[in-house]
């Protein structure tokens, strides 16, 4: 009896690649809504939480705390620096030294010069209702949390981006914290599951929204759509001053947009940042 099933190789490749793309998206590229964390962020936070002594420790030591739970050691230190980034709205780490600020294109110092620990806010933000599963390494005597349930969705407050394989790129803008809290209170005070809150939380005030209110509400209701954003800028005496940029954008993105004009000496760009963003064109 023939044990083989004939199948078109092209269709088989499409199916397998689609499954692989979903695995990458769900396991690594996209954050979970229950805690707003990608898998590596969850493991880093959990490792710091479990081994917290209350003292500031070097990034290499923080990475060692997460290593038992994550299979890719080279990515852990970079994730820790992102968690301690000065541009985050919610501070999940207490830091010491120059941790940089990605929104202002300020790079962090080398790992050996900076230290940190899990913040008091992070300890309060994540609740204790945790379900455990075997680690990806399959160690018998060690489990990891399936998720770190959070009282507020981090991916909507600190923002998030993900580039999966064969699926749409995800970019979540940072939302206003007070608006998020009001939104959840509004939901919790109504028992009707079909109840729609009076207003959705707006993006933070560091960007301009070019989409209409109806488009924004549709995105939040359905989870689908594109949000058009732009910088906050002013113009006076032929000088453009930019004081706010959309999530994941920085001065280098602005420079690339006007690179041709800069090379032709038609425009000049100066990054006048100190602590706050200020790009002058």
Residue ranges and their predicted role:
Residues 193-281:
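Charged, surface-exposed alpha-helical interface/stalk elements
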Residues 1-222, 280:
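Catalytic phosphate-handling regions of large nucleic-acid enzymes and associated NTPases
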């Amino acid at each position: 009896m023939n044990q083989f099933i004939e199948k078109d190789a092209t269709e088989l490749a499409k199916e397998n690649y689609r499954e692989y793309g979903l695995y990458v998206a769900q396991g690594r590229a996209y954050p979970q809504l229950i805690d707003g964390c990608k898998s590596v962020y969850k493991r880093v936070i959990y490792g710091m939480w479990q081994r917290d002594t209350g003292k500031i420790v070097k990034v290499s030591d923080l990475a060692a705390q997460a290593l038992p739970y994550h299979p890719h050691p080279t990515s852990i230190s970079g994730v820790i620096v992102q968690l301690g980034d000065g541009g985050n709205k919610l501070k999940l780490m207490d830091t010491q030294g120059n941790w940089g600020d990605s929104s202002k294109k300020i790079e962090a110092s080398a790992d050996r010069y900076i230290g940190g620990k899990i913040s008091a806010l992070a300890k309060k933000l994540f609740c204790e209702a945790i379900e455990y599963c075997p680690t990806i390494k399959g160690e018998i005597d060690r489990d990891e949390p399936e998720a770190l349930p959070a009282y507020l969705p981090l991916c909507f407050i600190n923002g998030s981006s993900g580039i999966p394989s064969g699926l749409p790129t995800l970019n979540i803008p940072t939302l206003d914290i007070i608006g998020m809290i009001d939104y959840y209170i509004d939901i919790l005070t109504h028992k009707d599951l079909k109840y729609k809150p009076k207003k959705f939380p707006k993006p933070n005030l560091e960007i301009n929204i070019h989409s209409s209110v109806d488009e924004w509400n549709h995105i939040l209701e359905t989870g689908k759509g594109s949000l058009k954003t732009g910088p906050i800028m002013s113009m006076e005496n032929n000088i453009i001053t930019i004081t706010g940029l959309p999530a994941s954008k920085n001065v280098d993105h602005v420079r690339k947009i006007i690179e041709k004009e800069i090379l032709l000496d038609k425009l000049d760009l100066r990054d006048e940042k100190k602590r706050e963003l200020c790009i002058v064109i």
